[in-house]
Amino acid sequence: MKIYLVGGAVRDALLGLPVKDKDWVVVGATPQEMLDAGYQQVGRDFPVFLHPQTHEEYALARTERKSGSGYTGFTCYAAPDVTLEADLQRRDLTINALARDDDGQIIDPYHGRRDLEARLLRHVSPAFGEDPLRVLRVARFAARYAHLSFRIADETLSLMRDMTAAGELEHLTPERVWKETENALTTRNPQVYFQVLRDCGALRVLFPEIDALFGVPAPAKWHPEIDTGVHTLMTLSMAAMLSPQLDVRFATLCHDLGKGLTPKNLWPRHHGHGPAGVKLVEQLCQRLRVPNDLRDLAKLVAEYHDLIHTFPILQPKTIVKLFDAIDAWRKPQRVEQIALTSEADVRGRTGFEASDYPQGRWLREAWQVAQAVSTKEVVEAGFKGIEIREELTKRRIAAVANWKEKRCPNPAS
């Protein structure tokens, strides 16, 4: 029995990055030998065991053979005669097909170290094409390591295009697509994930609402980058700089979906694209089974982001109505989330990346003022039932009006 550290832990250690999870491969052992050594079996489809002390995963070396469609159509063979090299060959990328033995020696049969140094994401073997999930995984790795200047090898991108054209991605379940997307959205450069999917044709298959934005022009006066798809990825990049929150990043990604519905004869203007986009956000979220809290914020951002940009000319009554509409009284975090997505929208434009966004500050300040109005004082003043809400609204509007006159006067007045 020989044990090797494999995959991501070896890769990240060689890159000088923190190692989070450790995976191990056991060569030359049977399931019974693992059980006799105190390991606990957890794998249903193939033999995976938990270490009795560390609880890290130890998998018996195995090979895989394509036996059906999609990413689940594989037959696994795990036995003592499976070599380490055979186990590593079934992995997706050369940089993930690395192992380290007890002496610290690196086993690298597929030149993963060379590709690490060259900053290349390259598939191990033609078997890559048998698993459509790998298209999304490569896109996610490209996003994860973009700050280290990794790029996808030409032959790997070509294979990803072939897989997409062959309809392989249609076998992916919504849950798997969303899981990879969720992980990609939490990387330092989530926009790279969607750019890679577009480069290989997968964006049109998996995210048609986003793909439809490319080639749709916006007024050059406001959008020097012109292309709405380009703007969308720029705003996502900016959102990633402004916030680590998945909610903020996903909502930013979806903020302009409505522009994809604008008839060509009305280009480059997109009046009413906010409310129009709400239906597309709902459609995308239902298809991919996106969690409700992310969906709800994304719909609000799609509908109201343009309103936030006009904050100086908004009436106090409109501002309080906005807080009602986003349910800020029960979910106060939404004020900050919407301020951040609106800022990402404005700064995600060519030449505006370093712009100030005072509207975000004003939104936060107005919220603090409105929130400070005391419900207790309204009740103690003798108001009852529906009168309480009406009086609260009246006092909130008055408080915001007083604040706005001093801090954010209407430029037209």
Curated annotation (Swiss-Prot):
The record lists Mg(2+) as bound by 21, 23
Task: Pinpoint the HD domain residues.
Answer: 228-329
Q: Which SMART domains match?
A: HDc
Keywords per UniProt: ATP-binding, Hydrolase, Magnesium, Metal-binding, Multifunctional enzyme, Nickel, Nucleotide-binding, Nucleotidyltransferase, RNA repair, RNA-binding, Transferase, tRNA processing
Catalyzed reactions: a tRNA precursor + 2 CTP + ATP = a tRNA with a 3' CCA end + 3 diphosphate; a tRNA with a 3' CCA end + 2 CTP + ATP = a tRNA with a 3' CCACCA end + 3 diphosphate
A Pfam family annotated for this chain is PolyA_pol_RNAbd
Record's cofactor remark: Magnesium is required for nucleotidyltransferase activity.
Q: What else is known?
A: A single active site specifically recognizes both ATP and CTP and is responsible for their addition.
Entry similarity comment: Belongs to the tRNA nucleotidyltransferase/poly(A) polymerase family. Bacterial CCA-adding enzyme type 1 subfamily.
Query: Under which name does UniProt file this protein?
Result: Multifunctional CCA protein
Q: Which gene encodes it?
A: cca
